[in-house]
A protein has these predicted regions:
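Conserved N-terminal phosphate-binding loop of PLP-dependent enzymes in the Aspartate aminotransferase
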Residues: 1-445
């Protein structure tokens, strides 16, 4: 095994892969703690509001993980021998399944499938819907394989592979440009501008337009549309929130038109909103749920509407599958992480700390003309900046001051901290934002 000095790491990355855009630091895997990331080269500490793009539930080196010898032994077992979970049963995976069902799996979504990667979770949710819709059509006497289109929203991000390329359409066109895509129905995303009370009429108007577009597509493609998919809260597209009334209207349309409703909670799921799933706060249960990131291993949950056809993909062996069936190391890690989440009541912490973060962001919008539309559920918070260039400069200045925050949408800042973050750490990060704002007082908004 090659041992490199920290100073050599960026050179090796640059020599072997395209490292453009990576943070100018080398993460110290051992010294970093919680939401404090340590640069192995400089020794500088960074306050982490990035959370490895919303995938870190506990932050770095949580003591209940690092000091748990039994958990470490299980991790070592899984790391030394990479098992094909789809074919071999292990006590390690069984333990994870029990914990996942207890903590994360609603009785409303009894079927589960696991795979590595959020995009592949979405892909398999779509495959489940295609199979279901085609079987529905065959039962109606439609002899051809019809029912393989997906209704989706503008400013969606569902991944960068296969089917998902036809759905992803955020502000960065290079994520999908020149790759082949399907011509699937896309409707307006009637995102809320906050405070909602001041923008309700506009939001309701956009909802009406979106629903009319959806109805029009169902009128001309009813037998073709297998599902409606949306992120319960759009992440990459701009941290866009939707009213429960709109989600319920989509649910009603799906029921009326023999289509399944899929929620993509790869980014907004697993506790960041203050409940394990964001949909639990909104009163609308999906038929299929794609998950990942903080759950460590990704996958799909499914509800009873799948049972309207025989031999759907969750009961017929081999219809959806992969060699690794997820990743056993991720499952073993997730098993203990979910237990720690319960022990430390981190859903409650995400809700209360998120409320504090949102209060600080609302105060920021009142203090500076460069900020508006503060929004959030739990710790999944964001705020708009008056221009993209200003947003990008602001993020760069924050990094220089030791705070890592990331952007989304056209000109928004998003916050994705670990669920363990404290009030003091939130204040420290927002105080840095407040300090760098005056530097931009003469910039073009």
């Amino acid at each position: 095994m090659i041992h490199l000095r920290a100073e050599q790491v960026p050179q090796v990355f640059g020599r072997h892969i395209n490292a453009t855009g990576m943070m100018p630091m080398v993460l110290d895997m051992r010294e970093s703690q919680g939401v404090r990331l340590i640069d192995k080269i400089s020794g500088n500490s960074y306050l982490d509001f990035f959370g490895f793009f919303a995938s870190s539930m506990l932050g770095m080196n949580h003591p209940k993980l690092t000091s748990d010898s039994e958990a470490f032994d299980r991790l070592t077992d899984a790391a030394v021998n990479k098992v094909a979970n789809s074919d071999i049963q292990t006590a390690h995976m069984a333990g994870f399944l029990e914990t996942f069902y207890r903590v994360a799996q609603s009785d409303a979504l009894p079927y589960a499938f696991f795979i590595s990667g959020g995009a592949l979770a979405v892909e398999n949710a779509l495959k489940a819907a295609f199979d279901w819709k085609v079987r529905k059509n065959l039962a109606k006497g439609i002899s051809l394989e019809r029912g393989q289109q997906v209704m989706h929203l503008r400013e969606a991000f569902h991944g960068r592979s296969g089917y998902t390329l036809s759905l992803t359409n955020t502000s960065d066109p290079w994520k999908t440009r020149y790759f082949p895509k399907f011509d699937w129905p896309r409707i307006l995303n009637p995102k809320i501008t906050f405070p909602l009370s001041e923008h309700l009429e506009d939001v309701e108007s956009m909802e009406a337009q979106a629903l009319e577009e959806a109805k029009s597509f169902f009128l001309t493609r009813k037998d073709e549309i297998a599902c409606i998919i949306l992120e319960t809260i759009q992440g990459e597209g701009g941290d866009n929130h939707f009213r429960p009334e709109f989600l319920q209207a989509l649910k009603d349309l799906s029921l009326e038109n023999d289509a399944l409703l899929i929620f993509d909670e790869v980014q907004c799921g697993a506790g960041i909103t203050g409940t394990f799933w964001a949909w639990e706060q909104l009163g609308v249960t999906p038929d299929l749920l794609a998950f990942g990131k903080k759950t460590q291993v990704c996958g799909v949950l499914a509800g009873p509407r799948l049972d309207e056809v025989e031999d759907h993909v969750f009961v017929k062996p081999g219809r959806i599958n992969s060699t690794w069936g997820g990743n056993l190391v991720d499952m073993v890690r997730a098993d203990r992480i979910l237990e720690i989440m319960e022990e430390e009541i981190l859903l409650s912490n995400a809700a209360s700390m998120g409320a504090h973060l949102l209060n600080r962001l609302n105060a920021l919008t009142e203090e500076s003309e460069h900020f508006s539309n503060a929004r959030g559920r739990g710790l999944m918070c964001a705020v708009d900046v008056s221009s993209r260039s200003l947003r990008d400069d602001l993020l760069s200045r924050c990094f220089e001051q030791g705070v890592i925050i990331i952007g989304c949408g056209e000109s928004s800042i998003r916050f994705r901290p670990a669920l363990t973050i404290t009030r003091q750490e939130i204040d420290e990060g927002i105080n840095v934002l407040e300090r760098v704002i005056p530097r931009f007082s003469n910039t073009i908004a």
